[in-house]
Structures are given as structure tokens and as C-alpha cells.
Amino acid sequence: MTLKQKWDVYSRLTRIDRPIGTLLLLWPCLMALMLAAGGMPDLKVLVIFIIGVVIMRACGCIINDYADRDLDSFVERTRSRPLASGEISTKEALILFVILGLSAFGLVLLLNGLVVKLSVVGIILTIIYPFTKRITNMPQMFLGIVWSWSIPMAYAAQTGEVPMEAWWLFAANWCWTVAYDTMYAMVDRDDDLKVGIKSTAILFGKYDRQIIGLFQLAALACFIAAGWSADRGLLYGLGILTFVGFSTYQQMLIFDRERAPCFKAFLNNNWAGLALFVGLGADYLI
């Protein structure tokens, strides 16, 4: 295998070629840093968290593909993944996971002790998540915890503590993650039923759209509460309204439960997250 071919395999394994997951992780993390700092976060902390998000998203993809390597070949969307197709060995994938994980932990060691402790929990959660799809119909709810863990870490890094304000943002992101990852799971639902992978898309059944809507409303309420507790103003409110607009559009996309529109709805959440981030940033700047 040439160096170019190896890079192609690694980029697909870590999803560097598909940044949507990194962006969905990044927006709430950046919001947490801004809220914790009351505006512009410490530059060192900001750089560490941005790099950390990229690395840990890659780690999550590797361990997810490792856990699903025997099932991915039966699912239309995942059968070409490097581990499922045999392009890379499990040993090589795990070595890469360890290298990236240690790199992320090395960055965390540059921060305070509370962040280090929280990061250990975060790594454990990241490793556990892929295996929850075997034992529970609600892996998206566990993913919501994993996907939101950077929020208390961001507050701890910036302030040395995790106040109630952080948990409002955590709850908002948890609800939002369950909503958009259920949309994602709707894409694979037929294949997942055949191979025994569990998901909230299967659990919610014919009420999937309605329950996604409830999670979107709960996320909205918690995002408002987080902004209220931080005394945010009109421009953050405009970001919230834009988030509502995108959420409404997503409901329209998933109405017929077809694969392509459901995937489009999932991808659209990047813009919803960006709207919240821009609204919050503008509220601090103007």
C-alpha cells in the first residue's frame, strides 16, 4: 500500500474526509468556552480544545468502527469502511486509537487538575459508547453524554469549576444530540433491524418524528436557560430563533422517513449549531 493509499484509509477511518461530526462537537464546546469566559476565552485553552475536539472525534470514529467491524459490512452506508472492508487490521486501528488518545490526554495535562479528571471520564465514555448499541435501544442517549462532555471540561478549564450554567448547556446539547442522531439512525433503520443493531429510531418507531420534535423543544428550552443564566441578550435570541427555523426545516425533511432526506436533516444540524455559536459570539462582541 502506497503512502497516499494509507492516508486515504486513515482519513476514512478517522472521518477526516467528513468533518460534520467534528463541527457538531465543536459548536457547543466553543459556546461553553465563551460562556465560561464571559466572552473571549483564554487563547491557550481555546487552541487546546479545538485540537482536542478534532483528535477525540477521530478516536471515537476508530473505536466505533472497531466495535462494529463485523456488522458494518451488512449495512449499506458503512460496508466500505476500512475495518469492515479489511483495508486495515484491527491491531493497526487500535494502535492509531491509542496514539491519538494519548495525544489528546497530553494536551489536557497542560490544563488544571479538574479538567484532567473529567478527561479520564470522557475517554472511558468514548470507549463504552459503541458497545451500547448491542445492549440498549437508547445508544443515542448515551452518545448525548459523550458528545456533551466537552462542556463541563470547557468550564473547568476556563474557571476551575463547573457551575449550574454549564449543566443547562450540557442538557441542551444532550437533547439536541439525541434528536439529530436519531435522524441519522433513521437512515440505517432497515439495515439495523436486520443485523440487530439497536437505536432510538427503532425504539421510537412510528412516533419517531414526534419524539424528535420533543427533544428539539427540550433542547431549545435548555439553550434559552443557558443564555438566561449568563445574561445573554437580543443577538443570542436571534441565534435561538434561527435554530428553531433549522429544526422546523429538519422536521419537514424527515416527514416521509426516506433515507436521503433524513441524512440531509442530520447534516443540516451543523448550520443549526453554527447559528447558535454565531448568535452567542455576536451577543458578546456587539
From Swiss-Prot:
GO terms for biological process: ubiquinone biosynthetic process. It is a multi-pass membrane protein. InterPro entries: HB_polyprenyltransferase-like, Prenyltransferase, UbiA_prenyltransferase, UbiA_prenylTrfase_CS, UbiA_sf. Pathway: Cofactor biosynthesis; ubiquinone biosynthesis. It is found in: Cell inner membrane. One of its GO terms (molecular function) is 4-hydroxybenzoate polyprenyltransferase activity. Its EC number is 2.5.1.39. Its cofactor is Mg(2+). GO terms for cellular component: plasma membrane. Keywords: Cell inner membrane, Cell membrane, Magnesium, Membrane, Transferase, Transmembrane, Transmembrane helix, Ubiquinone biosynthesis. The keyword Phosphoprotein does not apply. It catalyses: all-trans-octaprenyl diphosphate + 4-hydroxybenzoate = 4-hydroxy-3-(all-trans-octaprenyl)benzoate + diphosphate. The chain crosses the membrane at residues 21-40, 95-115, 142-162, 167-187, 210-230, 235-255, 266-286. HAMAP family: UbiA (MF_01635). Belongs to the UbiA prenyltransferase family. NCBIfam families: ubiA_proteo. This is 4-hydroxybenzoate octaprenyltransferase. The lineage of its organism: Bacteria, Pseudomonadati, Pseudomonadota, Gammaproteobacteria, Alteromonadales.
